Regions:
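Asp-based phosphoryl-transfer active-site loop
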Residues: 1-6, 27, 169, 189
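A generic structural motif
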Residues: 20-25, 144-150, 196-197
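Residues at the C-termini of beta-strands that transition into short coil/loop
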Residues: 52-55, 152, 203
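Active-site phosphate-binding/coordination module
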Residues: 7-97
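Conserved acidic, metal-coordinating active-site core of Asp-based
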Residues: 92-177, 183-185
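Alpha-helix C-terminal capping segments
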Residues: 18, 40-43, 84-88, 139-143, ...
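Short glycine-/acidic-enriched loop or helix-start segments at secondary-structure transitions
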Residues: 2-3, 36-39, 63, 117, ...
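Mg2+-dependent phosphoryl-transfer enzymes with acidic/Ser/Thr/Gly-rich catalytic loops
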Residues: 157-217
Length: 217
């Protein structure tokens, strides 16, 4: 979803203030470059000290590609994913069920092309049915060399073990503080949350803004 203009302006000012006192700000997301720019805009994407795309499997700095993973999804994994998703009540609602990205694959039974209303309906349903949790568990069981974690409201991120968001910490120096919305076990923010010095598990832009503006950590 696109970042609200008021939040984007607030965040841009906050990043500028943090840079003045010597802190570095990085974005870590499961989304690819194109989607991230759609969400936050090119100016902010370039302004931060770095943007880790695809769960840390690709790094951009000031718009320049620094490094990226070479992992690709196998035919066997694709077949497994399709077989699982075809059994879902939500399969076929929208397009883009499988989205191959650098170093990972993002899957969604309802499809990333769903409307905002469909997204909310699926998200509410999934909280009760735990469909995504079940799918992730199956993928990990069949492919123990891979990890699968819940991401956002409708999808699952799949990548080689150890190639999750926590890998970005290898590039960090000093104390690290992380903000994420899926920091619980099974979420794609959990690996980095459990290894960082401190983290906030946020549930809305409003909560994130309040913490940024009022917390001294």
């Amino acid at each position: 979803q696109k970042m609200d203009a008021d939040f984007r302006n607030m965040f841009g000012r906050w990043v500028k203030e943090q840079k003045k006192i010597g802190n570095k700000i990085f974005l870590v997301t499961g989304s690819d470059k194109k989607k991230t720019i759609q969400q936050i805009g090119i100016p902010l994407w370039r302004f931060v000290d770095g943007c880790y795309q695809n769960c840390g499997n690709q790094l951009y700095h000031k718009g320049r590609l620094i490094k990226q993973s070479s992992w690709r999804m196998s035919a066997e994994l694709r077949l497994l994913i399709v077989t699982i998703m075809e059994k879902s009540l939500w399969y076929g609602v929208a397009d883009t069920n499988i989205n191959e990205r650098v170093g990972m694959v993002n899957i969604s039974t309802i499809g990333r092309g769903c409307t905002a209303e469909q997204r909310k309906s699926y998200c509410d349903w999934d909280k009760q049915s735990l469909e995504r949790e079940s799918i992730a568990r199956i993928i990990r069981a069949v492919h123990p060399e891979l990890d699968a974690a819940i991401g956002g409201q409708i999808s699952i991120d799949v990548y080689p073990k150890g190639k999750d968001k926590a890998q970005v910490l290898d590039d960090m120096e000093g104390e690290t503080i992380f903000f994420g919305d899926t920091c619980e076990i099974g979420g794609n923010d959990y690996p980095i949350a459990k290894k960082t010095d401190f983290y906030y598990n946020v549930s809305s832009p409003e909560e994130t803004q309040r913490l940024l503006e009022t917390n001294s950590r």
